[in-house]
């Protein structure tokens, strides 16, 4: 299962780097929870798909160049759910060039029919926009 989960997040990485919003949406349940430093929200996939292009554009304009999968730790909760801690390596462009920064998120995945995985809960452990902004003045 660990290899399957790693493949899932490599697919997530590819979807995140492409302009094909629907491929990002394919990885999420129809309704999911999103948590971050400001709290937790229930999100409908259709609403999420409307926001993704604006979010990508905003982060790109701030200097986000690339997001790459770094680490994946999988912990089965039961036969249907997996807790996954993921490390991302993000590349941020600032006035002195590009800098790599680590970001972390925890996901709860649901294992559906045919072992298909979907994100039902995502917790970002930092506000990505704040992380990118903090790198703009770093040399």
In which residue ranges do the predicted regions lie?
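Short, low-complexity N-terminal intrinsically disordered segments enriched in polar/charged residues
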Residues: 1-30, 135-139
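Hydrophobic alpha-helical core bundles mediating ligand binding, dimerization, or RNAP-core interactions
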Residues: 9-12, 16, 28, 48-55, ...
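Beta-strand residues in well-ordered beta-sheet regions across diverse protein folds
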Residues: 35, 84-85, 120
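Generic short beta-strand segments
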Residues: 31, 85-92
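Short beta-strand edge/turn micro-motifs at domain boundaries
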Residues: 99-137
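A solvent-exposed, acidic/Ser-Thr-rich amphipathic alpha-helical stretch
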Residues: 2, 21-74, 80
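Hydrophobic/aromatic beta-strand elements that line small-molecule binding cavities or substrate pockets
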Residues: 48, 69-75, 88-90, 104-111
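Short, cysteine-centered beta-strand-loop-beta hairpins and adjacent loop/turn segments enriched
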Residues: 90-100
């Amino acid at each position: 299962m660990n290899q399957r989960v790693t493949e899932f997040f490599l697919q997530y990485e590819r979807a995140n780097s492409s302009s094909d919003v629907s491929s990002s949406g394919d990885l999420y349940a129809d309704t999911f929870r999103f948590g971050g430093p400001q709290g937790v929200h229930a999100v409908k996939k259709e609403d999420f798909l409307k926001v993704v292009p604006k979010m990508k554009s905003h982060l790109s304009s701030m200097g986000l160049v690339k997001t790459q999968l770094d680490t994946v730790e999988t912990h089965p909760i039961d036969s249907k759910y997996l807790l996954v801690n993921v490390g991302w390596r993000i590349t941020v462009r600032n006035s002195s060039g590009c800098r790599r920064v680590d970001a972390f998120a925890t996901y709860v995945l649901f294992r559906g029919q045919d072992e298909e995985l979907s994100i039902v809960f995502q917790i970002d452990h930092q506000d990505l926009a704040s992380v990118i902004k903090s790198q703009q003045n770093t040399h």
